[in-house]
Amino acid sequence: MRYVASYLLAALGGNTSPSAKDIKKILDSVGIEADDDRLDKVISELNGKNIEDVIAQGIGKLASVPAGGAVAVSAAPGSAAPAAGSAPAAAEERKEEKKEESEESDDDMGFGLFD
């Protein structure tokens, strides 16, 4: 990431085709050592490309990635999922009832003033 950021800094600073020397100079200014293999890889991937286009492509790819930890699961129509789903639903209702009871007992913070 540091190499990409340095490349972008150089490109946004007016250098349309930053070299390894340019990127190393940026990294050295903040005390970061450069790995030549990774640096060469970044330069070869980005060299000759329009930075705005690369950023736009990246934003498009990030938009397609699910975020927030939500799991997207879909059952195929006509599958056995609804029949199998009734047992976990009943267990889930029992868990909810137990959870509600425990929440009520926690309202008084365990002191039981009116018990």
Curated annotation (Swiss-Prot):
It comes from the Eukaryota. The modification N6-acetyllysine is found at K21. The modification N6-succinyllysine is found at K21. Disulfide bonds: none annotated. Residues 91-101 have a biased composition (Basic and acidic residues). GO terms for cellular component: cytosolic large ribosomal subunit. Residues 76-115 are annotated as: Disordered. Plays an important role in the elongation step of protein synthesis. Heterodimer with RPLP1 at the lateral ribosomal stalk of the large ribosomal subunit. This is Large ribosomal subunit protein P2. It comes from Equus caballus (Horse).
